């Protein structure tokens, strides 16, 4: 029986498969965006950028003595060790639109309750953004063993991510 993939692992799997990269060895239970970025890099996608804005986790990481037994800090430290830079970057409509336009894929961390319009949901969720037309963004949403593809308004996506640190991984086109 196949292990069910967490949404972050599903995002990594989707992007690796689209780049014709084997996905047999990816972790099924990745939850930290830094963990997703490390997996993408370890599997050959090195042209990555990581952005966040107003993230409590990142602020604590850069301003305090950190406890590396906490996975959130451990993976951020590993990004540092791998020379993957995290940039604090505000998320406005224009900057977000530009990020989407200038990348092949973006993995975005959204607040589940906002993204699904369901206040009973808690925690974060990862989705893939893949291009836009005007204010409409193509969203690939990993759900269990499949991917739901839909179009959402850019303002809605900003609303869904801004209170969760606006964490995003920008995956640029790889040179072949």
Predicted regions and their residues:
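Predominantly the structural core of cysteine protease catalytic domains
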Residues: 37, 41-116, 121-123
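Short coil/turn linker and secondary-structure boundary residues
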Residues: 21, 87-91, 149-152
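Active-site nucleophile-adjacent alpha helix/oxyanion-hole segment immediately C-terminal to the catalytic cysteine
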Residues: 1-51, 98-102
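Sequence-level detector for tyrosine residue identity
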Residues: 6, 14, 51-53, 58, ...
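Short, flexible active-site loop motifs that bind/organize anionic cofactors or intermediates
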Residues: 2, 86, 147
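Noncatalytic regulatory segments and standalone regulatory/sensor domains
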Residues: 100-103, 111-126, 130-176
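Short hydrophobic/aromatic-rich motifs at helix boundaries and adjacent loops
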Residues: 7-10, 84, 129
């Amino acid at each position: 029986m196949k292990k069910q993939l967490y949404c972050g692992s599903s995002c990594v799997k989707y992007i690796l498969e689209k780049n014709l990269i084997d996905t047999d060895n990816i972790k099924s239970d990745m939850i930290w965006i830094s963990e997703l970025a490390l997996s993408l890099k370890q599997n050959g996608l090195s042209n990555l950028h990581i952005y966040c804005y107003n993230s409590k986790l990142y602020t604590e990481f850069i301003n305090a003595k950190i406890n590396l037994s906490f996975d959130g800090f451990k993976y951020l430290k590993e990004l540092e060790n791998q020379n993957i830079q995290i940039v604090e970057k505000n998320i406005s409509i224009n900057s977000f639109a530009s990020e989407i336009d200038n990348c092949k894929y973006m993995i975005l961390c959204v607040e589940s309750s906002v993204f699904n319009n369901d206040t009973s949901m808690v925690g974060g969720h990862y989705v893939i953004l893949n291009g836009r037309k005007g204010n409409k963004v193509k969203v690939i949403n990993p759900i269990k063993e499949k991917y739901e593809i839909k179009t959402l308004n850019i303002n809605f996506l900003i609303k869904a991510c801004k209170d969760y640190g606006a964490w995003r991984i920008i995956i640029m086109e790889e040179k072949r």
